[in-house]
Amino acid sequence: PKSVCTSINNVICHGIPSEDEILQDGDIINVDVTTILDGYYADASRMFLIGNVCDEARKLVEVTKESVDLALKEVKPWGRLGDIGAVISEYVHQHGYTVLRDIGGHGVGNDFHEDPYVCHIGKRGTGMLLVPGMVFTIEPMVNEGKEDFFVDEENEWTVYTEDGSLSAQWEYTVA
């Protein structure tokens, strides 16, 4: 419903900005921005630490960013989407976190969400072949607790961790 989503603490994704929600010392927030230029979409998000953030939250944000950095190295012609998911899930699980399987990256172009679906859990050497000209997002959503989630019943958009644990996300559009 907005061109910018703000996902705070246990909001996994699609948090709707509100002037009623004031950031607090120690919060972590993901700001997810969609842009359209000449009919083409792009999508990106970044994490921000507000004030004095505890070491556990800081580590979650760092591990999530590091998993994306590793995944970006897997993006090359004739690679596989499964390689991207594998490197993310392996790294995240090594650090004791979970990564969402049911919500992931997506193709972008003339529409905001296009094929392919980019799962952030995968097996090396499997999945769609990466070919020149593909444009898609890599955006793992990493939870401090379990990967279970629920969608806000009122707005049918905002996604929360089921167990109330923190969640972090970094997103890049790659071409």
PLM region descriptions:
Residues P1-A175:
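Active-site neighborhoods and metal-handling regions in enzymes and metal-associated proteins
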